[in-house]
């Protein structure tokens, strides 16, 4: 069992990106500013700095090698999930399972939402197989953690056996 956790800023291209951070919040820091009071334009606890970013494809190649196959990839990037996936598009066929947190509302300025990510993954060979978690705020569903499986993975056959 070989597992690596890699904490880095990923995007669909290399370069510098503005990164919004709140010194008093333990969540929500992102390249896409949150549409919340914690990251409002008048909040003096929020700082913006330029950080270096890389693509998922380059990160995997540099850390795991050119021929890496990924059994399980989790992405929770505060609205940047689609950008990260686009930056790893050539890797997608080698990934078996994806777990993504996806917003259903405009939670991060210019952040991707569930429908766009779902459409991209379906077009690139993945099936949604399970909603792992629902996140609500004041009774409104705002995000989901969703499990996607590569349509060419043997797991799809097992799932189909259970369903049909």
What role is predicted for each listed range?
Residues 1-164:
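Phosphate/nucleotide-binding beta-alpha loop and adjacent structural elements of enzyme active sites
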């Amino acid at each position: 069992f070989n597992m690596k956790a890699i904490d880095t800023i990923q995007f669909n291209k290399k370069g510098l990106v503005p990164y919004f951070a709140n010194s008093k919040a333990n969540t929500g820091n992102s390249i896409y500013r949150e549409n919340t009071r914690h990251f409002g334009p008048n909040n003096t606890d929020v700082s913006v700095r330029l950080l270096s970013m890389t693509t998922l494809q380059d990160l995997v190649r540099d850390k795991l090698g050119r021929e890496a196959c990924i059994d399980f990839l989790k992405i929770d990037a505060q609205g940047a999930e689609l950008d990260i996936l686009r930056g790893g598009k050539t890797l997608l066929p080698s990934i078996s399972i994806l777990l993504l947190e996806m917003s259903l509302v405009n939670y991060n300025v210019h952040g991707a939402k569930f429908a766009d990510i779902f459409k991209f993954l379906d077009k690139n060979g993945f099936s949604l197989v399970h909603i792992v978690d629902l996140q609500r705020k004041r009774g409104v569903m705002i995000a989901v953690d969703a499990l996607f499986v590569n349509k060419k993975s043997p797991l799809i056959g097992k799932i189909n056996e259970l369903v049909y």
